[in-house]
Amino acid sequence: MNRRLGSTEAIYYLLDTLYCLNFVVFVEMDGTLERANLDRALQAAQQEKPLLRARIAQVDGHPFFEAVPMEQAPLKAQVQTLRNWRLRLAEQLDTPFTGEAPLARFFWFGGRGGQSVAAMVFHHAIADGKSGAQVLVDALRRAGGEDLPVTLQAARPSAQDLDPINSKGVVESTVQKLGFWLGQGRATLKFAQQLPGYDPQLQAQRSIKAIPYTVSKEKGRALLAACRAHDTTVHGVLGAAQILAINSECGAPEERHLALNSLADLRGVLRDNLSADDLGLYIATLTTVHAVGASPDLWQLAKSIKSELSSLLHSGDANLIHSFYPRASLLPTSRHSARLVQAAAALGPPASMLTNIGNLQPLTLRNGVPIRSLAFMVSPPPQHPICVTVAGYAGGLHLHLLYDQTKLGDAQAQRIGNALIGFIDAAIDPSNPSEKP
């Protein structure tokens, strides 16, 4: 496990020294599990996944993953009452890790009536939403009595080390990088508009709040069918709904450019056939800028989002967004370095953020306890007024709109969220016009 952090991991690690970048994945269940079984399941997870028993050490001023004996850093279930569990999970988004192992936490919220919530909080440098959800689900399956084999998984290289661009010649890879950054420059020249009145600068204090929304199984299936009929994706239509919700806050209808920051899963384009079972940070933050007319069409916008993201992913360029942090000359760990990285990250077009970990099939544990829902939340970067997280489960969608209360008012955040859901409902029901929630 002992290796230097890759560029993406190092960026997230440095930014985490400025503002907490945790994410949490959680499930709601109709039943309970024994604490001893949970602890054994978490021990098995640590045996399998080297990053769950690693700390971030400083070697010559640079961050390295360093293995720690499991007995020195066991991952144990923290048991709490069910009351106010959502509030306490939101607080975890702003409760930093120290860099010591384990770089994850497990919470069990239980109460009367048999309902419970299981959650895992991750330091973002060791995982992304997709792989974090897989760790949680496997732990619950084991705790529920399923005899999953414990297979030691070798530590995976960073996203940069698995990028196919490394197998190209110097000239070819340089041309590819140049083309990518020219494209980013063209996107910047479209002058995307920021949410009026929003200050993207990092503030001394943060107060993260999450607003949950649910799209039912029936509506989720109808939305998927509508996406297929319009030759786009669920992420495309969710992104379009989000852009139009922001657009509704921008004053009188007129043509303007708005941007969307999508966290894209890179497992399909990196080497080594990675899957969700490979714990790690294998995502790219991709910003696309879109023209929004005075009478915008949701489906046209959804197709544009799908097309631009697909082009970046299939061209092999998606991972290059983090190449502004060169591997050969990694910045030393310091608040000054972190501020330089934050300043570079903030140079992109002003955008809201959308991250979607895909769909999980319905699951009932071996002991008969059904999982009712799966969702996740992430601490929003300061340059984005809102961050919307999406997890599909059993055909439905579980969304959270996250924002910093010190920078965005509760009423406006609620208004944006309600508009977003309104546009989703309009996409499902053809009798509703797509330009109004």
Residue ranges, per PLM feature:
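Acyl-thioester-dependent acyl-group transfer interface
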Residues: 1-60, 80-104, 248-437
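Acyl activation and transfer enzymes in specialized metabolism, enriched
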Residues: 30-50, 120-137, 212-254, 399, ...
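Acyl-thioester-dependent condensation/acyltransferase catalytic cores
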Residues: 39-137, 141-145
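ATP-dependent carboxylate/phosphate-activation module, predominantly the ATP-grasp catalytic core
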Residues: 66-67, 212, 355
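Short, solvent-exposed coil/turn linker segments
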Residues: 69, 74-81, 96-98, 151-166, ...
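Amphipathic repeat-derived elements
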Residues: 112-117, 121-123, 128-134, 138-141, ...
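Short, well-ordered loop/turn elements at secondary-structure boundaries
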Residues: 113-115, 228-229, 348
